[in-house]
Regions:
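Hydrophobic alpha-helix feature that most strongly marks membrane-spanning transmembrane helices
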Residues: 1, 18, 22, 30, ...
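Periplasmic binding protein-like
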Residues: 1-44, 48, 78
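Solvent-exposed, polar/charged alpha-helical surfaces in well-ordered, non-transmembrane soluble domains
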Residues: 11, 15, 19, 57-64, ...
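Short, solvent-exposed loop/beta-turn-alpha elements that line the ligand-binding surface or hinge
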Residues: 16-20, 38-68, 97-129
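Bilobed periplasmic-binding protein-like "clamshell/Venus-flytrap" ligand-binding domains
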Residues: 25-28, 70-106
Length: 129
């Protein structure tokens, strides 16, 4: 496979992504929330953000299960399965990522982060030495 990169304007890229007239495109993908579900929703078959036109009923079913999951362990398992489908079927090919860094002041402990990416500081207490 030989690829020749060609620069395009933002308008040309948006048009090509919108109507599917591309073979390979490099674009920034962001989630609207700090949770894997927010990221994965972009490839649901009904999503307008699904520029790759990825369609897989098993993937859509996993997203439905994830959305209604009350058991955090089951939800995380489904998130991993959905991500694996995207990667195995070549719907996405991540090249790099940026991350959100955070830290808790020395001497404190107890911050919690749930499976949806939300932080809870209700249990933060001074660290016992």
């Amino acid at each position: 496979l030989q690829v020749t990169a060609r620069a395009v304007t933002a308008e040309e890229l948006a048009a090509a992504l919108g109507d599917g007239t591309f073979s390979l495109a490099g674009t920034e993908v962001r989630a609207l929330g700090s949770d894997a579900e927010c990221f994965l929703l972009q490839w649901a078959s009904t999503s307008q953000e699904n520029v790759s036109r990825y369609a897989n009923s098993a993937y859509d079913t996993l997203l439905s299960v994830i959305a209604g999951a009350e058991d955090e362990t089951a939800r995380l398992g489904c998130l991993h399965d959905a991500e694996a489908l995207l990667l195995e079927e070549g719907a996405v090919a991540p090249l790099y990522t940026t991350v959100t860094a955070w830290t808790l002041r020395d001497g404190l402990t107890g911050v919690l982060r749930d499976g949806r990416g939300w932080f809870s500081f209700a249990a933060v207490v001074p660290r016992s030495e």
